[in-house]
Amino acid sequence: MNHDFNQDFFSLFGLPRRFAIDAAGLDAAWRAAAAQVHPDRYAASSDADKRSALMLATRVNEGYQTLKSPLNRARYLLQLSGVDTQEENNTRMPADFLMAQMEWRESIDDARADVDALESLSRRLRGEVRDLQTELEAALDARADLDAAAVLVRKLRFMEKLDQEIGDAIESLLD
């Protein structure tokens, strides 16, 4: 059993190194790769081959989770290009984006007791997330503007946190 553990996730699944990917193609490639390296297929193999199969199965699943998520896929593309998104230590954002974040948080706080209002906010937020993903696709695939893409990744991370907050609020009301 000889596999290249250093190949990037796009190569692992036979996909072009782009932000815009064919989700169905990724799913099919993941299923095929996962079946090929499933540890049960190596039950009668040597311990070394079993370990190798387990490591590769883990890598296949990690790759799938990374590429399936637009945020993680964008981070990964930037990482492959040597760009650190600095999400932990660079919280500088354009003033208009910060104002929008404050408005979102106020709207969430105002709607905390109303499932319908929270679900409406969630739909609006998902629309904004789709817009950011479209901007990310343009920055990464069309323009190769890595600095702009890093800022968009930080914005998308903020938006995903808001979506989680809305989801948590809805869940607490339904419990």
Swiss-Prot record:
Function, in words: Co-chaperone involved in the maturation of iron-sulfur cluster-containing proteins. Seems to help targeting proteins to be folded toward HscA.
Keyword Chaperone set for record: yes
Similarity annotation: Belongs to the HscB family.
InterPro entries per UniProt: DnaJ_domain, HscB, HscB_C_sf, HscB_oligo_C, J_dom_sf
Lineage of the species this protein comes from: Bacteria, Pseudomonadati, Pseudomonadota, Betaproteobacteria, Neisseriales
Alphabetical keyword list: Chaperone
Molecular functions (GO terms): ATPase activator activity; protein-folding chaperone binding
Description of how the protein assembles with itself and partners: Interacts with HscA and stimulates its ATPase activity.
Gene: hscB
NCBIfam families with a match to the protein in the record: hscB, PRK03578.1
GO cellular component: iron-sulfur cluster transfer complex
PROSITE patterns: DNAJ_2
Protein's GO biological process: [2Fe-2S] cluster assembly; protein complex oligomerization; protein folding
Protein name according to UniProt: Co-chaperone protein HscB homolog
All residue ranges annotated as the J domain in the record: 8-80
